[in-house]
């Protein structure tokens, strides 16, 4: 299973990263990571767009869900049944917004291996015939940071931008909205950015750079879809 995952995901992404490193002027692995991130986000754009629209729809109907919960507050079984009937009547899948996360998880796992190999230069035997081996890899991002090592600035940026993204989504909630989902969302808005920052602080800065760029892309996409809606 590990070999299959390597062949279908890790190896192609590694080759794409090295190809970008070879063709982008300056041979800066940071620029190659940014370019790879943008390509991945464009590839996943349709699924993220669908997810954001689903989240927006769920937030728009939050007052009606709160009303159902208040109506059946003393009968949890009736409350659950009424909510499910409401979802079915309005053709809503409450789990559809989780799809991009499920898609992104294996990509993140693969990218972890890609960046470890790429940043260390341990790429021999994994390159396709049409991708030249650059030899040594320049891991200094514009000469300012070594992406092969953890970097606290990138870790803080990764957590900070994720907080901004979460805050943008929460700001659409109705003032005073209650309910378990709303309470959990508020808790996750603070917990996940902190967790992201801690993880990023322990990993090579190249992975944190990926997370910064992909989150910035998501913020722009989220702003566009919410304003358009």
Residues covered by each model-derived region:
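Helix-loop-helix
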Residues: 1-229
